[in-house]
């Protein structure tokens, strides 16, 4: 098994029929994202490119094979509790495979659900996630975003 790189991650918002595939993080113990809704993704393994990590993690968590995706931005998280993380943010609008109900509820990371894009802000999200989700909807260009947290509180957000 390859070594996970703790501070390099991917996150993908898979789109279908005006919805994003969201994950409700309710399955893992000791999860900094416990109870939050996020996209699909995970940690790089040693030697992986962002795209290789994206494709592997989406397949592992959902069973879907992405066929069309865009690298949308880099999000730098700085936290007094969890250190620093560099997240490679993607959207995807093409995939092969199906998500049966059993897979939606049985993902080891949490529960998967298709959520209408306009209803995503009503979910229990990190404050910083609200910022980059808005950027994904409003901008077409690549962006860099730095989010600083003290505990669970967002203390600073800078868009570059």
Task: Name the predicted role of every residue range.
Residues 44-67, 77-136, 156-160:
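Unchanged
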Residues 37-43:
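Short glycine-enriched, charge-decorated loop/helix-capping segments at active-site entrances
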